[in-house]
Structures are given as structure tokens and as C-alpha cells.
Design a protein with these regions (language model features):
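Anionic-ligand-binding alpha/beta catalytic cores of soluble enzymes and soluble regulatory domains
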Residues: 118-164
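Catalytic beta-strand/loop module used to bind and position nucleotide/cofactor moieties
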Residues: 4, 68-69, 76, 81-85, ...
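Short, electropositive, low-hydrophobicity segments enriched in small/polar residues
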Residues: 13-15, 99, 142
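N-terminal glycine-/serine-/threonine-rich phosphate-binding loop
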Residues: 1-76
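Active-site histidine-anchored catalytic micro-motif
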Residues: 27, 44-47, 51, 60-69, ...
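Intrinsically disordered, low-complexity boundary segments flanking structured domains
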Residues: 22, 99, 156-160
């Protein structure tokens, strides 16, 4: 049994969540899909990071977590798959996973390189679904990507209280 979690900023009004689940089930009928949240504020990577960090440890080791928040592959933002704490995380390299790796060194991180093996009009979520299904069938990360040693540095706003 493979568990694949979904955390997105898609909301529930449109067809996007259902289409993503359909894509996963079309490739891997035995997958168990669990929604963590689809109500992340649009492009709010900090909120997504908080949700993933708070939720992932409630799932068994080997769970695959797809994070579809600010997930477009533009500029120097690449898609990544990371094995960390015996879980797998698939998302854009946009800072979402930075809080996790501050606590424990990742077992492996790859920059996903299968985009050219899929249809030219494939969506980012279809790539994430293909990677999740590959991993859920016991596939290795180095088959779907090139190993990288670190994530993109992203500055995070922090709050503080002062007497001013």
C-alpha cells in the first residue's frame, strides 16, 4: 500500500484536486490518497511549509507528500524530490522544505529531470504525480532526477517584538 498526501493552494471550487487524484489513480490504482490541505493561501510557501512540518510525522515512513504550492518551474526554480526522515517530498525548490532540512540532513535530494520524457503540454502536477507513482512502485530517485546537495536559499520573514 502506498500513501500519497496532497497539500495544495488549489482550493475546492475547481476541478484541479479531482484531476490530480485521477492522474495518480490512473497511473497507480492501489495508491491511497490523503488530503492534508487544499486551502493554503495562494503561493504561500511558508504556510505550506508549516502544514507539511506539522502533518508529515503522523504518516507511516515511506509516505509520499506532493506539495503543489507555487509549483511552477520558472527561472531558477526547479522541481525536486527529497527523501527525508524516511518520507518523500515532491515540490518546487521554493523554500517549502527548508525548515525540514534545518532539523535533519536529507537522505537524498534530486532535481527532477523527467519533464522531457513526458508530453510537451504536461502540467507541473502531472510531473509530480508521475514521480509519486514511480516512488510508490519502489522506483529510485536517481531514475527521475539528478542528485543535488542543497536546496535553493530562500530568505524567510520572521516576526519579533520590540519596545519601539
Amino acid at each position: 500500500m502506498s500513501i500519497i498526501t496532497l497539500t495544495t493552494d488549489f482550493g475546492h471550487k475547481d476541478y484541479f484536486v479531482g484531476a490530480l487524484k485521477g492522474k495518480i489513480l490512473s497511473e497507480h490504482k492501489e495508491a491511497v490518497i490523503v488530503d492534508i490541505s487544499h486551502e493554503i493561501d495562494l503561493f504561500n510557501t511558508l504556510e505550506a511549509s508549516y502544514c507539511i512540518e506539522a502533518a508529515y510525522h503522523n504518516f507511516p515512513k515511506g509516505t509520499i507528500h506532493i506539495i503543489g504550492v507555487d509549483s511552477e518551474r520558472v527561472g531558477d526554480t526547479q522541481h525536486i524530490a527529497m527523501q527525508w526522515d524516511d518520507h518523500y517530498f515532491i515540490c518546487a525548490d521554493n523554500g517549502i522544505l527548508n525548515t525540514l532540512i534545518q532539523k535533519k540532513i536529507p537522505q537524498k535530494i534530486v532535481a527532477i529531470t523527467i519533464h522531457d520524457r513526458l508530453n510537451t503540454d504536461v502540467s507541473d502536477m502531472a510531473v509530480f504525480a508521475a514521480v509519486a507513482c514511480h516512488i510508490s512502485r519502489g522506483g529510485l530517485l536517481n531514475v527521475i532526477g539528478k542528485e543535488i546537495k542543497s536546496l535553493k536559499e530562500v530568505s524567510v520573514l520572521t516576526s519579533s517584538i520590540s519596545d519601539d
